[in-house]
Each structure stands twice: as C-alpha cells, then as structure tokens.
Amino acid sequence: MIKITLKDGKVMEIEEGIKISDIAMKISPALYKKALAAKIDGETVDLMTELHKDSSLEILTFEDEMGKWALRHTGAHILAQAVKRLYPEVKLAIGPAIDTGFYYDFEADFTFTPEMLEKIEAEIKKIIKENHKLERFELPREEAINLMKEKNEDYKVELIEDLPEGEVISFYKQGDFTDLCAGPHVPSTGKVKSVKLLSLAGAYWRGDEKNKMLQRIYGTAFTKKSELDEYLNMIEEAKKRDHRKLGKELDLFSIHEEGPGFPFFHPKGMIVRNILESFWREKHTKAGYQEIRTPLILNEALWHQSGHWDHYKENMYFTNIDDGDYAIKPMNCPGGILVYKSSMHSYRDLPLRLSELGIVHRHELSGALHGLMRVRCFTQDDAHLYMTKEQIKEEVIGIIKLIDEFYKLFGFEYFVELSTRPEDSMGSDEDWEIATNGLREALDSIGKEYRVNEGDGAFYGPKIDFHLKDCIGRTWQCGTIQLDFQMPERFDLSYIGADGEKHRPVMVHRTIYGSVERFIGILIEQYAGAFPTWLAPVQVKLMNITDSQYDYLKKVEETLKENNIRVEIDTRNEKIGYKIREAQLQKVPYMLILGDKEVEAGKVAVRSRKDGDLGAISLEEFIEKIKNEIKNKTN
C-alpha cells in the first residue's frame, strides 16, 4: 500500500500501481466525471498515470489552469487529426495550448480559407463524438525518428533530433492519429465538449524569420457550450475595445514600419502617460520612495555580473563604444544597484526605497509584437528596496497595500500568485526558503488570498504576481514583488549594522504598472477609450451653434484653461448634432454647447458622455463639478 496526500490534507492508503483516474472515482464519482488531469508532487500528469510511491495528489478540472491547459492541448491534437484526415499531405509542426485556447502550425501547398475552417470544425466534432482514448507511449530516439519519417513529418523529425541525449521521447495516439508530444492530455477526445476555430495567421517555423512561413490555425475549447458562447461574446467585445484600433481613432499613439515594436506617443497619448506617471510619483513620494534615473546603455560586463547575460542575452540589444562592448539595458536593477553602491549605508538608512521610471529594451520576435501590449521598448515602473531580513515582512506588506491602492483606483479586481523556485535558479536552499517564507508570511498576515505557482519564480528569487481582471473577464499580469538574496551577493552590497560590522542587505524588486505602455493599453481596453474625466486627454469639448457665439466661446475657453481643465473648441460651420456625435466618438467626458440663450444668460448647456443632457448651468457651477470629479479621481 502507498499513502496519497490530497490537496485538502487528507491521506488515503491505496494499492500500489493504481491509476489516478481510479483514485478520482474513489474520492467522488462527480470529481471523476469532471477530472481532466492531475498534479503529482507538483508535476502535471495524465489521469492514466499509475502511482507507485507515496505522493501528494491534486485532481485537476477545468476550473484549474492546468486542467484547462490539458483540455486545450488535446483540442490542438484533435485539430491536427481533423486536418490530416481532410488534407493528408499537410505537414504538422507544433500545436500547444495557450492562455485562451490553442493553435497548430501546418505546412501546406495551399492556403487555408474560412470555408476550410468550417469543414475542419465539422471533422473535429466527429472526432470528439468518436471519443478516442489518448494513449501515451515512449520510443527510443532512432525508432521515434523512423516513425516520423514514415509519416513524412519533417518538422517532428527535426524536433526529435534537437532533443538532448537521454531525453524521454513520448507520443500520444488517438484513433488513427499519432503525434509527438510530452503531454499531458485528457483521457479521451470526448472530454473536449465544445471547440471553436477562431482565426488564421502566418507563423515562422520556430519563430525565426529566416525559416519557412507556416499557416497557424487558432482555436479554443471548453467543457460546456455555455462557456464557449460566453467566451465568443467576450472576443466580440474585445474587438470593439482593441487598444490598437482605439489608439488610432483617439489619436493616442501609433506604431510605424520604421520602428516595429517601438511605440510613438501622440500629444493626447502623452497627456494620459504623464498623468499616470505624475500620480505614480506622488504616491511613491508619500510612501517614502526616492526617485532615481539610470543610463540606457551600460557595459556588457555588468550584465555578466548580474546574471542577466545567462538568462536574457537572446533578448538584448548590443552596441560598441570606444572599442568596448555595451548593452542597452533590458532591466533597471543593475543600474539601481550601482546607485546603492555609490555610497556607504548604515542600518539606520534601511529600508531604502529607490524608484525609477526606467526605459528598457527587450528584443521580441516580430510575430509576438502586439500594439502596446508586447513591445521592444517600454518604461518599467521599477522600485528596488534594500532592507534587513527582519524588515522583509513589513516592507512587503507596504508594497502590497500600495499596489492595492493603485488597482482599486482604476476599478480592477485582481488575484495574487506566489511563484516559487524555478529549475534554473541561483542561490542556496536556505536563502530561497527564507525569501519564500517572507513573501508567504506577508500575504498571510494581511489575509490576502493567493495561489501558489510552483517553479515559476525569477532566477534570483521567489515572487508575488498581481493579475488584473478587466471588465470583460480577461486577466493581465502587471504588478510583481520579487525577493532577491542573489544580486546583493553578486554585487557585494553591504550596510553597517548596529554591531559596526558589514552585513548583506536583502533586495526587493517590484513594479505596479509593470510596463507603463502596456498599462495604458490595458486602460484603453478597460475603459473602451472612454477614460474617466481625471485621465481623459480632452476633458471638455466646447462648441458653438453659430458664429455669433464665438466671442463668448473664447471667454469660456480661457476660463476653463485658467482652472487647468483640458479643453478643445469646435467652431466649424457644422450642425451642432454632428459636432456632438463627433465629440462622443472621441469619448470626451463633457460637451459644453453655446447658443444665443446661453450667451444671453451667461450659462453653458452641459452634455455628459455618461448621463446625456444635464441642462444649462452657470460656468462656475460646471467648473466646481468637474474639478471635484478630477480631484476625487472618479471612475
């Protein structure tokens, strides 16, 4: 008999060699029906996996991220099987699960069309109905290569040949279809209840522009049709809110072929950006942070010393200055460390909180670029805090509260994830344990719920990630708190303790917006371009009905500007209804309409983007109203 510890702490004694699916049935028939995959000692596996030793076990359903992943991974295999049935000459490349579904890349001597997708989708439904079992098997390298050569799958052969010697080479078979895959998968194709193919795109093999362009089919999968329908509605809403579309319509930013991945901010976009950065500075000053600025370009040796060279070299840009090798910074932390090292520190100086709105550059493949969400140049709202081990808990609590204040202001719900030590980490077991426990204790002490994401920490320390949930249910990872014992060691950082001796400080890396550019993109989509008044590039659109109100309009404009209200005027010889519609399309919070009646009464007719016609009021009354709205940062 072996002992199995369940997620709730309950221990089961069961016979050795039992399959996880059978354990799920023993726990509950309802759980067995919903089960998609499992975690054994933190590793995600198939339900058909047999257990031969004492283990911790978590049964995964569609409510769990890795349960979704397993189902959608199987969805990708079903897509590939359907394509091969209909178009046998097509060659298979790769087909992973992704956050919102799955995709599969194909090489074909024809172009897939929307009509073909309908045909493929019909075949997918047949495969689901056939309910084929997914059977995993392993082969030695030569046999695996020969199997894929027999099937004329050149890309699979290349993948196998690139695997390290001794690597397990596994396949999954479902009916008449076999694919190279590490898994895990759901037990049968019938578990994938609802599938929808979403779009077509081009994708270079292995993301390299020098390689062949393949055809990518995107899809998604759910366990219920109602969930799929809800997701498809969300996609339609997301299209309306697409920040790339709204960014152009509202004249906020642009991206040009002369600089792919390098956004250009227009005057209105700069207003939004400057407000966000000013607010950030104000809150950080109150929280005891001191702002610094570090150079864009630093000697290559610095990145070797920090360890970033080993982990980020492929995503860095380089240059040569005076025969020396330099790198454009992909992160702000090494520069911030040099600021710390520039003077001696006492324990009385700690905690020391240094903040920086630092521009960083990271190379992204052209196919991964996406508006402001995925760029090659962005501003990271970093802060690096230096402290004693005893100060970790209180400092982390302070950061969590600051992050919470920011996200609530913008109307975001969020969830928290604690990520633990990855395989390619630096540092001792003891340091990692102290660091992880420090983050865990801070979260526990303020009653903040969190998930544990095993093995997803930074290479230098564990981290807390903050995932925003927007108004249509999508999640965005923005804020992060990363505890770091390694950088202080690598850079020989120290402070003088109360005993007069040198001690090593603990370092915390943290962001709130994450990337300022990306956060702006998220806000554009969160508000569908209709920024709250305090954040709107234009707060008031002032418009006259005829030329006879022009002089009064200019006086009103001047008064609004004197009160620091952002105003634009529309004096074109157009009908007032046309002007109002255009201002509404520009998402302006307030329109002030001036006709002869308003001139005579010394008033303004107010129209709100949100509430419609508010009637005629005095200019003073309107100014008081809008200034209160701006001051209170009303959403």
Curated annotation (Swiss-Prot):
Top EC class for this record: ligase
GO-annotated molecular function: ATP binding; catalytic activity, acting on a protein; metal ion binding; threonine-tRNA ligase activity; transferase activity; tRNA binding
Pfam families linked: HGTP_anticodon, TGS, tRNA-synt_2b, tRNA_SAD
Region (Catalytic): 242-532
Cofactor comment text: Binds 1 zinc ion per subunit.
Annotated disulfide bonds: none
Residues binding Zn(2+), per UniProt: 333, 384, 509
InterPro entries with a match to the protein in the record: aa-tRNA-synt_IIb, aa-tRNA-synth_II, aa-tRNA-synth_II/BPL/LPL, Anticodon-bd, Anticodon-bd_dom_sf, Beta-grasp_dom_sf, TGS, TGS-like
Subunit and partners: Homodimer.
Name recorded for this polypeptide: Threonine--tRNA ligase
